[in-house]
Swiss-Prot record:
Stated name of the protein: GTP cyclohydrolase FolE2
Keywords tagged on the record: Hydrolase
Domain of life: Bacteria
Alphabetized Gene3D superfamilies for the sequence: Urate Oxidase
Disulphide bridges, residue numbers: none
Gene Ontology molecular function terms on file: GTP cyclohydrolase I activity
Name of the coding gene: folE2
GO annotation, biological process: tetrahydrofolate biosynthetic process
Site (May be catalytically important): 155
Enzyme type, top EC level: hydrolase
Catalytic activity reported: GTP + H2O = 7,8-dihydroneopterin 3'-triphosphate + formate + H(+)
Pathway, per record: Cofactor biosynthesis; 7,8-dihydroneopterin triphosphate biosynthesis; 7,8-dihydroneopterin triphosphate from GTP: step 1/1
Coiled-coil boundaries: none
Length: 269
């Protein structure tokens, strides 16, 4: 036996040893590792971006630890081929490789949409934070898409009581949707932006700035209005089985935010 083999034999595998505390671990793995990915782009076919991965598996009570290096190996063997289409396959590979009952992968990445200004038509990119969450439990795969959409909100009360003007601010609407099939990121973003006082743009000329200012003023909404209107849009989408809608207004006249949340599972009557 050569020296390398002798060394390997002599090195104890501590993580594979038994644990006597009789306590299982729901999720164990790695967090915050970045890797290049490909994402389906409705306009251009594919978009290359960098994702931040969290990867976990279930660990039975009788095992001391999991094989942390195997998570990295799964990412590295796929090089640049990670995409939405093979997301489930990668998750199943992870569960099989680590001999786990259940597994979870969270993939968070910036996604860019090319938008045209409302009057001038000048184009610019706007970024959105997107997270894909895949889970395998009892052999069943589920997929969840989470999108953070920045929008403008304008206060109806401020408009009503003021002789001119109204306070407005940037807001974040977060939709976490459990889907039964493929849903374009762009379509989910559009469903949110349509319910805001006004959507955001990366670049605006003066005629565009006038338009978005007046658009928001003519379409005032409380944080409660936004979550209800977005929830109604989620209810109307047949590809969405369940969702959580959150809205946070970064109040321009306060040092705190306004917040609202609606959670609904359409499969439950």
């Amino acid at each position: 036996m050569n020296e390398i083999c002798d060394t390997a034999v002599c090195m104890p595998d501590v993580q594979s040893s038994a644990d006597t505390r009789q306590i299982a671990i729901d999720k164990v793995g790695i967090k915050s590792i970045r890797h290049p990915v490909r994402v389906a782009d409705k306009a251009d076919g594919v978009q290359h971006t960098i994702a931040n991965f969290n990867m976990y598996v279930f660990l039975p009570h009788n095992f001391k630890g999991t094989h942390m290096s195997r998570f990295i190996e799964i990412l590295n063997t796929r090089e640049r081929e990670i995409s939405v289409e093979n997301f489930e396959g990668m998750l199943r590979q992870m569960v099989e490789r680590l001999e786990a009952e259940s597994g979870y992968i969270e993939m968070t990445f910036p996604y860019f949409i090319n938008k045209s200004a409302p009057v001038s038509g000048v184009q610019s990119m706007l970024d959105y934070e997107v997270t894909f969450v895949g889970a395998i439990e009892n052999g069943q795969y589920t997929h969840t898409t989470k999108v953070v959409v920045p929008v403008t909100s304008l206060c109806p009360c401020s408009k009503k009581i003021s002789e001119y003007g109204a306070h407005n601010q940037r807001s974040h609407v977060t939709v976490t949707a459990k889907t039964r099939g493929f849903l374009w990121i762009e379509d989910l973003v559009r469903k949110v932006e349509d319910q805001a006082s006004c959507e955001l743009f990366g670049l605006l000329k003066r005629p565009d700035e006038k338009y978005v200012t007046e658009r928001a003023y003519d379409n005032p909404k409380f944080v409660e209005d936004i979550v209800r209107d977005v929830a109604a849009a989620m209810n109307a989408e047949p590809l969405i089985d369940a969702y959580v809608v959150e809205a946070e207004n970064f109040e321009s006249i306060h040092n705190h935010s306004a917040y609202a949340l609606i959670e609904h599972d359409k499969r439950k009557k």
